[in-house]
Regions:
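Charged helix-capping and loop-helix junction motifs
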Residues: 37-42, 123-129
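Conserved catalytic cores of phosphodiester-cleaving nucleases, focusing on short active-site segments
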Residues: 107-111
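Structured beta-strand-rich core segments of catalytic domains in phosphoester-bond hydrolases
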Residues: 3-4, 27-106, 198-201
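N-terminal, active-site-proximal structural segment of metallo-dependent hydrolase catalytic domains
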Residues: 1-47, 54-57, 62, 217-247
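Metal-dependent phosphoester-hydrolase catalytic domains
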Residues: 83, 88, 103, 120, ...
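Active-site flanking residues adjacent to catalytic metal/cofactor-binding acidic residues
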Residues: 26, 112, 142-144
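Short, glycine/acidic-enriched loop or turn micro-motifs at the edges of active sites
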Residues: 30, 114-116, 147
Length: 247
C-alpha cells in the first residue's frame, strides 16, 4: 500500500475553506504507517476547532480488526456545535457495518458507508430505517451508499423514512476524474430546508465532494433555529479508500 498523505494538506485546506459546522469522515485513517501514525480525523478537527466522534468501521469481532492498516480505518463526525449525545451502531450484515449517530440540539446526524453487496445493502437500509424511525428530531443521513444498481435501490428506504435527497439534480460524484455515478448522498427530513447544493469538480480523491447549505425552521415559532452548511468529500488513497464527509 502506498502512503495517502499526498493530498491530505490540500483536503484540509478545502474543508477549512468551506467553514462547515458539521464534518463527517468515512474511511479516515486513525494512525496507520501509511499516514505516518497520525490520526487524520483528530488533525482535521484541530484545524477546524471541532469536537471529534470516531470509531473503527469494523465490528469488534471482525477479522479486519486484526489486519494492519485496515484496523486503523474508521469513520468520524466532527462538529463545532454542542453535542447532546453520541452513539455507535453496527449493522447486522456486511463487512463495513458502522453507523455513527451524533445528536445536536436541533438535528440528529447519521454517517454511513454501506456494503458493496446488494443484498447486504438492502438489509443495512432496513436497519437504518429502524434507527431513523426512533428519532424525535429532524434527521440528516449522509455517506457513501454504494448503490451500484442506481438510486432505485433507495426508493423503498426513502418512501418509508420520508427523507429527501439534498442532491435534487442527481449530480454525479464518482469517479472524480470523470463522474458518471451517484454513490454519495445526503438525505434529510422535510423540516430541513435546502438553500444550496453543489458538487465541486476537484480531484483530491476518487470521489468528488458534495457541498450543501441548509436551514431548520422551528414550527412552533416559524423562526429559523439553525442555519448550516454541509460537504461530502473523499481523501482516498490508491489502495484503501478514505472518505471525508463535511456535513
Amino acid at each position: 500500500l502506498k502512503p495517502t498523505n499526498g493530498h491530505f494538506g490540500k483536503i484540509v485546506e478545502f474543508i477549512k475553506s468551506v467553514n462547515p459546522d458539521i464534518v463527517g469522515l468515512i474511511e479516515v485513517d486513525f494512525g496507520s504507517y501509511r499516514v505516518e501514525r497520525f490520526n487524520q480525523a483528530e488533525t482535521i478537527a484541530r484545524e477546524l476547532n471541532h469536537q471529534v466522534v470516531c470509531k473503527s468501521k469494523y465490528a469488534e469481532a471482525s477479522m479486519a480488526r486484526k489486519v494492519p492498516v485496515l484496523n486503523k480505518q474508521g469513520n468520524a463526525i466532527l462538529t463545532g456545535l454542542p453535542i447532546v449525545a453520541r452513539r455507535y451502531h453496527f449493522f447486522n450484515e456486511g463487512v463495513k457495518r458502522l453507523v455513527i449517530e451524533v445528536e445536536l440540539q436541533e438535528v440528529i446526524v447519521f454517517l454511513v458507508h454501506l456494503s458493496l453487496k446488494f443484498r447486504h445493502r438492502q438489509y443495512q437500509l432496513n436497519d437504518l430505517h429502524a434507527l431513523i424511525a426512533g428519532c424525535d428530531k429532524p434527521v440528516i443521513v449522509a455517506g457513501d451508499f454504494n448503490v451500484l444498481w442506481g438510486d432505485r435501490e433507495l426508493q423503498l428506504f426513502l418512501a418509508a423514512s420520508g427523507l429527501t435527497s439534498a442532491n435534487v439534480r442527481s449530480q454525479f460524484s464518482y469517479p472524480s476524474r470523470n463522474p458518471y455515478r451517484e454513490l454519495d448522498y445526503i438525505f434529510h427530513s422535510p423540516e430541513i430546508r435546502s438553500t444550496g447544493f453543489q458538487v465541486p469538480q476537484i480531484k483530491l480523491s476518487d470521489h468528488a465532494p458534495l457541498l450543501w447549505d441548509f436551514e431548520i425552521d422551528d414550527p412552533k415559532t416559524d423562526g429559523l433555529v439553525l442555519g448550516n452548511s454541509a460537504v461530502v468529500a473523499r481523501p482516498a488513497g490508491p489502495s484503501v479508500p478514505l472518505t471525508a464527509s463535511v456535513l
